[in-house]
Amino acid sequence: MSFKLAHRDACETAGNWRLVRRTLELGAFGINVVELPAGERIPEHDETARDQEEVFYVMSGSPTLVIDGEDHPAAAGTFARLDPTHSRTIVNGGPEPASVLIISAPRSSGYEPMDWA
């Protein structure tokens, strides 16, 4: 199939994760949504072994991005880019659920931006 369309609620899940990459059958980059209830977090980690850059986009809620041990409150609409070596976690200390879109790709993927971008 040359394209695939899926609503977030129809994506395959694993715990708090919406597995967008798997649902859309992507091979060039990773893209998933983590939905964190109040008081939850994702495990602290880095992406050094896979040499992956990550972009976080806060879709809803007000989680805290903890980057190298430093707290960065992030309201809905916030973007963050992380080099592979940075330790990271997402903590939802607020009263409302938080949803964060995470996009990742190896730095060696060969991506070349268009001139206008």
Task: Explain the meaning of each model-derived region.
Residues 89-117:
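Double-stranded beta-helix
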Residues 69-85:
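Short acidic-glycine-tyrosine-enriched beta hairpin
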Residues 33-37, 48-66, 103:
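Short, conserved beta-strand element in jelly-roll/cupin
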Residues 21-23, 43-49, 91-93:
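Short histidine-centered beta-strand/loop micro-motifs
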Residues 41-43, 80, 85-90:
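Histidine-centered metal-chelating micro-motifs
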Residues 55, 62-64, 71, 87, ...:
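Structural motif
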Residues 1-30, 37-38, 111-117:
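A short, N-terminal "cap"/entry segment at the start of jelly-roll beta-barrel domains
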